[in-house]
Amino acid sequence: MTITDLVLILFIAALLAYALYDQFIMPRRNGPTQLSIALLRRSRVDSVIFVGLVAILIYNNVTSHGAQMTTWLLSALALMGFYIFWIRTPRIIFKQHGFFFANVWIEYNRIKEMNLSEDGVLVMQLEQRRLLIRVRNIDDLEKIYKLLIENQ
């Protein structure tokens, strides 16, 4: 096993740990989930570049008769990238005392101001940071509003 294979295993393990945390652990942290809303994805250009570069590496490894283990590890890395960037849906998860946004826990008392932009983006102003929440379904903004009023 080469150093390249070890690095690939490390990256695959990191992506797998992130996927498991995002899918199974985070919804169970900090109490029961009150509301979980699907968000719009960010630009997919970065993901296409990543998966494309890994596909080029797979092609290069196969045509130069590289190690079969490296080809399998690159394929697993491409599949993990495809899952994280294309299949997994980003979500905002509301709990009793706060919410998870982009895998970060934010308590409700940190919200200083909330606005709704003309294009349906909920803007939450924290102490030193501004969150731009783009929901997939515009009707979910009303659910978020009702939940935040209920918890304030």
UniProtKB/Swiss-Prot annotation:
InterPro entries: DUF986. It is found in: Cell inner membrane. Keywords: Cell inner membrane, Cell membrane, Membrane, Transmembrane, Transmembrane helix. It holds the Pfam family DUF986. One of its GO terms (cellular component) is plasma membrane. The chain crosses the membrane at residues 6-26, 45-65, 67-87. It comes from the Bacteria. It is a multi-pass membrane protein. Belongs to the UPF0266 family. This is UPF0266 membrane protein YobD. It comes from Salmonella arizonae (strain ATCC BAA-731 / CDC346-86 / RSK2980). The gene is yobD.
